[in-house]
Amino acid sequence: METKKQDGYARSRCLYVAEAALEYFISLLVTGAYLAKITSAIGMSDMLTGILTSFVSLGFGFQIIAVFLANKRPVKRWVTLLHCLNQMAFALIYFIPLVHLSHEMKIFLFIAFLLTGHILNNVVNSPKINWFMSLVEDKRRGSF
């Protein structure tokens, strides 16, 4: 009778898939039509919305920061912290229309949360992927 070898990463893979799905859902909520709806709800002009959405294309510049942060140091702690802050910044965008603040303060908070979220996303994404990939043996990658 053959016994199955215990898979130590089964739970981690399930949690990774759940985290990736949540991250994807949040990323959808801060782009396209959803972003346009939020900006119109807080009274931002279309011109300012266009400028902010083009900021995403500058993300490669912030990925360079990750090289210096991840250089020869453990990434688990700071990647987890920055990734949580990144997702929190994106999620907080949706509470701005619900808060009773001045028009200018709502726009300021929106810009601060959006830019912070995108900057942190670009800083943390590459080291996070490298860390997650290092948890899986080379010959087992790609199979769930």
Locate the predicted segments by residue.
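Hydrophobic core of transmembrane alpha-helices in multi-pass small-molecule transporters
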Residues: 21, 82, 89-96, 102-124
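Hydrophobic/aromatic and small-residue hotspots that mark the transmembrane alpha-helices
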Residues: 66-70, 132, 141
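Intracellular juxtamembrane helix-capping segments at the cytosolic ends
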Residues: 121-136
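Loop-to-transmembrane helix entry/capping segments in MFS-fold secondary transporters
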Residues: 46-47, 136-144
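Helix-loop boundary and gating motifs at the non-cytosolic
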Residues: 1-70, 76-80, 86-94
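A short, ordered amphipathic alpha-helix with a cationic face
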Residues: 23-27, 119, 129
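Membrane-interface elements of multi-pass transporters and channels
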Residues: 29, 72-73, 99-103, 135, ...
